[in-house]
A protein has these predicted regions:
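Asp-based, Mg2+/Mn2+-dependent phosphohydrolase catalytic module
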Residues: 1-22, 127, 131, 143-302
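N-terminal helical cap/lid subdomain that shapes the substrate entry/recognition surface
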Residues: 2-128, 134-138, 142, 150-154
């Protein structure tokens, strides 16, 4: 087969489908959920209540440098620097607004806003995908592998997704491992097998690996990270930011600056409207796929 291969929605056949899924893990931010409005617009909405006049475009320009510096000075959200994740994010918020000084009460309100549906939107296709995949494969194991901090648990509970993934959540902060390193995928794999030894009565570990899938929105961390661990990687590219779906492959290289902006510049409702119209799947090789939405992805499985 020649790659990359474009597979229209009406062209799927048994020969094109992947293996039956036993384990599916997801990235978190911009995969399970995303911001309703760009992050800096939301910061400014809160700021307005406190008399702070700031331009979202200016804050957006400030963000990549502030984010990069904090990650370098206080890696893993401050875990090794005697500061907690909330203090780490508070510092980010204050530095993004600098030189404007903002009150602590405003910082607290911004943090609270980003703990649930005030800020976030859960894509409708995710809810349908989870429902359908559990109906088709009652013993499917669902999990999360994310480079994030424990504040995530509060958010996941508030948006109603915690119970779906509760037994299999793997965070970089807690494990001192991070995507795209295959070690975090291997840790998740071995932990799941330890919890579900019944799988080894039917499959070898090598065989189980052929039935593992990871879904996420970043090329390096999710698609290539999963492939490096022997899993099938699925790039969920709702905005075609990497260019595979439109065959604009000059877009595939995204540096740290662009990736930083991806984290804050999403308008998820508009993104959903756009992504739901794209129904092709791009297969890059036997272990890598690109889709625009999860409705399309259901066709991948037998």
């Amino acid at each position: 087969m020649t790659y990359p291969k474009r597979i229209p929605l009406n062209a799927w056949s048994d020969a094109l489908k992947a293996a039956k899924p036993l384990i599916i893990t997801f990235d978190a931010y911009n995969t399970l959920y995303a911001t309703k409005l760009p992050v800096m617009e939301q910061y400014c909405i809160v700021g307005h209540k406190y008399g702070i006049k700031a331009n979202p475009l200016t804050l957006t320009k400030n963000f990549p440098h502030v984010f990069k510096k904090l990650k370098e000075n206080y890696p893993q959200y401050g875990k090794f620097s005697n500061i907690g994740p909330e203090e780490w994010w508070s510092s980010l918020i204050k530095n993004v607004f600098a030189p404007i000084e903002i009150p602590d009460e405003m910082v607290s309100e911004i943090l609270l806003r980003f703990e649930g549906f005030d800020s976030y939107f859960v894509y409708p296709d995710l809810i349908n995908f989870l429902k359908n995949v559990k109906a088709r494969y009652p013993n499917i194991i669902l999990g999360i592998i994310s480079n994030t901090d424990p504040i995530f648990y509060k958010l996941l509970k508030n948006i109603g997704l915690y119970e779906t993934f509760a037994d299999n959540i793997y965070l970089s902060y807690e494990l001192d491992l991070a995507k795209p390193d295959k070690a975090i995928f291997e840790y998740a794999f071995n932990d799941i097998i330890d919890k579900r030894p019944d799988l080894l009565k039917v499959y070898s570990k090598e065989e189980i690996c052929q039935h593992c899938f990871h879904i996420g929105d970043e090329l390096k961390n999710d698609l290539e990270g999963a492939e490096g661990a022997g899993w099938t990687g699925i790039l969920l590219d709702r905005n075609d930011k990497y260019g595979y779906l439109s065959e604009s492959l000059d877009k595939t290289v995204r540096d740290e600056y662009k990736l930083s902006l991806d984290k804050i510049d999403n308008h998820s409702i508009k993104t959903w409207e756009t992504s739901s119209k794209q129904t092709d799947t791009i297969q890059l090789n036997k272990k890598k796929y690109v889709v625009s939405n999860l409705e399309v992805l259901e066709e991948l499985f037998p």
